[in-house]
């Protein structure tokens, strides 16, 4: 009988080295940034992020050793029903995470005993179940993917989830879902003419959709592209973030240096890229971008090497999350994109978003491990 150590090493070898290295580097960089700003963020943020990191790596190891095909094939209906249920519960009983004056109801309190209050953002975890169920749905109808009734079914599937998120007021997360949907459909071979028709429909529907947005959401978008128009209101965060980045210069103010980030709201979450740049300069910001780029490229390579359609689509969906959230997170910090409440992957402090990212990386590890297993079987 093999020892636990031997079995552990064998399971560890199933994990992809590049993915693991990138995840480790980004996690360490996040902890280092929060540690350097502990006087401003508070020790609780550091302790929470440290705990989420350890739990996250355990989840990566756990999920990487699960057969993703068996998991999704067995649970995809339950995953979809759970997603609808938890988003509906959040819509009915949710609270705003940061600003109670907004109509955002994207957080759900699960523990509220005395001074102990634990809230989660279900839409972050639903990203995982949505990618799994949408990939499964596409794989079931791939032979008739360009038939209108097939696409209608896929749009209903996606529309239920995105609609519930929009109703909760979480515009930023809804946009990430939209990007995931488009990339997964594109990679599944949907005709380009459907995308052209979709863009035309969006342009026609835009004036009506605009009226459906809450006033604070409209303001975020309008002043997001030009924060100078409202420097003491909606544009203030973006402009302060931009100042923090400029204050960092090329090499930064040091781990415990910098001052602009101290007054910047959400400097440990949505605007943590500004904190990174003020402390570690252009070099630190560029380093983060390079590591994320390597991570995304590796995920795409794993998708390209996968012979299973569902595995491919899972990886492409995960890559969409990293691409969109990184671009939006950096764009917000540079004051060139609207502030829509998007966390920076493996950098922003937080429980829900951090654990969700570790879980989806675990799924990519699983896809890679299963492909290796079947590859060796074919070689033999």
Regions found by a protein language model. Give the residues of each.
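Helix-loop-helix junctions and helix-breaking kinks within/between transmembrane helices
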Residues: 37, 152-185, 214, 280-284
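Hydrophobic transmembrane alpha-helices and their immediate junctions
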Residues: 283-326
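Hydrophobic, glycine- and aromatic-enriched re-entrant/interface helices and adjoining loop segments
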Residues: 99-111, 115-119, 196-287, 309-311
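Membrane-helix boundary/helix-loop-helix interface segments in multi-pass membrane proteins
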Residues: 2-13, 18, 32-168, 320, ...
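Transmembrane alpha-helix boundary/anchor motif
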Residues: 58, 66, 133, 208, ...
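Hydrophobic transmembrane alpha-helices of multi-pass, membrane-embedded glycosylation machinery
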Residues: 175-185, 200-203, 293, 360-362
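Helical transmembrane-bundle signal
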Residues: 23-30, 83-90, 295, 322-325
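Interfacial segments of multi-pass membrane proteins
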Residues: 138, 180-194, 260-284, 342-357
């Amino acid at each position: 009988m093999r020892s636990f150590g031997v079995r552990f090493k064998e399971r560890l070898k199933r994990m992809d080295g590049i993915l693991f290295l990138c995840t480790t580097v980004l996690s360490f960089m996040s902890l280092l940034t929060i540690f350097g700003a502990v006087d401003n963020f508070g020790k609780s943020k550091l302790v929470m992020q440290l705990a989420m990191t350890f739990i996250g790596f355990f989840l990566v190891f756990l999920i990487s050793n699960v057969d993703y095909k068996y998991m999704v094939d067995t649970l995809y209906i339950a995953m979809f029903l759970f997603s609808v249920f938890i988003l509906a519960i959040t819509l009915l009983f949710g609270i705003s995470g940061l600003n109670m004056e907004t109509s955002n109801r994207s957080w759900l309190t699960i523990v509220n005993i005395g001074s102990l209050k634990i809230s989660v953002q279900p839409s972050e975890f639903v990203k995982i179940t949505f990618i799994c169920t949408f990939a499964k749905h596409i794989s079931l109808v791939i032979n008739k993917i360009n038939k209108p009734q097939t696409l209608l079914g896929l749009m209903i599937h996606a529309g239920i989830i995105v609609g519930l998120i929009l109703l909760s007021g979480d515009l930023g997360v809804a946009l990430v879902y939209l990007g995931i949907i488009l990339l997964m459909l594109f990679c599944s071979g949907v005709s380009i003419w459907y995308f052209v028709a979709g863009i035309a429909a969006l342009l026609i529907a835009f004036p009506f959709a605009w009226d459906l947005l809450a006033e604070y959401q409209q303001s975020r978008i309008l002043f997001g592209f030009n924060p100078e128009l409202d420097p003491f209101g909606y544009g203030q965060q973006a402009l302060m973030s931009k100042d923090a980045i400029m204050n960092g210069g090329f090499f930064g103010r040091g781990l415990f240096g910098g001052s602009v980030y101290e007054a910047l709201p959400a400097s440990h979450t949505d605007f943590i890229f500004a904190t990174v740049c003020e402390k570690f300069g252009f070099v630190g910001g560029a380093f983060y971008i390079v590591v994320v780029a390597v991570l995304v490229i590796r995920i795409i390579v794993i998708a390209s090497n996968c012979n299973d359609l569902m595995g491919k689509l899972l990886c492409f969906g995960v890559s969409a999350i990293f691409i969109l959230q990184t671009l939006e997170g950096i764009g917000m910090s540079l004051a060139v994109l609207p502030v829509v409440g998007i966390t920076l992957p493996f950098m922003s402090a937080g429980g829900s978003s951090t654990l969700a990212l570790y879980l989806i990386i675990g799924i990519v590890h699983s896809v890679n491990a299963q492909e290796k297993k079947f590859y060796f079987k074919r070689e033999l």
